[in-house]
């Protein structure tokens, strides 16, 4: 579990790189987040949810859970990016809710995207 939650706003969690693989944070070639992994960047009382980025220049496989929720009294949901520049396997969940505000944003950003109906990957 990684927890960057705060009373007045969520923090930032970067795994494998920064937003869209840009900036000075070194990028991973491959990133794997297991099904028992949980990442929180919630505003606990007030404020906006934080930012969580899961990135890889080649392949990202994400099976965990992310929350970047807005505060219980005020605030909007945060921003979550789960991206593999070439390939993305997304089998996890992201909760960007906000009881008193607007939902946050989820960015899934591989080079190509295929959406398949079903109950699982494989």
Regions found by a protein language model. Name each.
Residues 1-122:
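Extracellular and secretory-pathway beta-repeat/beta-biased strand scaffolds
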